[in-house]
Amino acid sequence: MNVEIISSKLQGTIDAVTSKSYTHRALIILSLLNNCGKIINPSICEDTITTMKYLNAMGVKTIIENNVITVSKQSELINPSFFPYNDNSCTSIRLLLPIVTELFTEANFLISEKLFERLTNTNLESYFDYQFSSLENNKIMLNVQKKAQLPYLKLEKTSQYASGFLLLSVLKNSKFNFDSITLPSYLLMTIDYLEKVGITFDIIKAENTTQVNTYNYNLINYYNFNVEGDYSLMAN
């Protein structure tokens, strides 16, 4: 599968940089597909490089050449003894935590104290059981485990955990409950992306909540598509 990320225009006049939000999701989705693929015109920045390092630790090979990232793997994804040091990228860890805890039940991440504080200030404890130990040089070893039952997904502080859980749709049919009737733009972007690889969504709105059911019966491994949006370098 090849994904081309098209730079959009802000208000129709200013060229926006390629979206790192799309690049994160493309890297993760391709890594979960059997035959992987290529990302054309990706955003190469600190955040997306961190996502690639995490995927590399899981046995995914990523090669950057001529503004294309080639994503491949030779076997099932593996759980490293710990994921490589991450100083600042909340996006990478929030999007991947739902996936690695689903695949491996628990995982260890070497992170900075600053990143640990950012994670714990954005509902980490709502979705995962965790323990941590302080190391030298202001580093933290974070052990994260899958909760027995997933609660309502909170969208107030960040939708990145929620997007990570939605990305699980590539692996299995799922049901998610959100604490809002309005889904934020980044979550809708994730849904749009997943629909392009064949995931079907059933979205049911109640008075103050939204239920999203996902079905991967028609998952596509070989379809090429383009994505476009005004997300630039923002993250939410």
Question: Which residues does each PLM region occupy?
Answer:
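Structural preference for solvent-exposed beta-strand-turn elements
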Residues: 1-236
